Amino acid sequence: LDQRRRTFSFTGNSYFFIPSIHPSSLLSFLVSCCWPIGQERVARPASLRPRWHKPSTVLKVLNPRTVVILDHLGNNRTVSIDNLKPTSHQNGTTNDTATMDHLEKNE
């Protein structure tokens, strides 16, 4: 026989079972059974947020997988196309800066 008393609290269509136990172990009980599983999402600092970059100009195609681009410093760089990300208008949308996220414009 279980000698602990049980208390029930009805809220709407759900109920919570909280056994009558010592307060020091009550917290660990609540953490283990009642709080949501998973990590709470927090706001990402601006320094870690992905930033919008102006698309690079492709100057020359060396072979089907390698191109020469003009980087943001004005230098020619030989890069693999695997390291390039298609711009939005290459994915079936228009090249319209008015549709750009306002946060991306400010950074």
Curated annotation (Swiss-Prot):
Region annotation (Disordered) ranges: 80-107
Domain of life (superkingdom): Viruses
Feature: compositional bias, Polar residues: 80-98
Pfam short name (any one): SH3_11
UniProt name for this protein: Putative uncharacterized protein S1
Protein species of origin: Human spumaretrovirus (SFVcpz(hu))
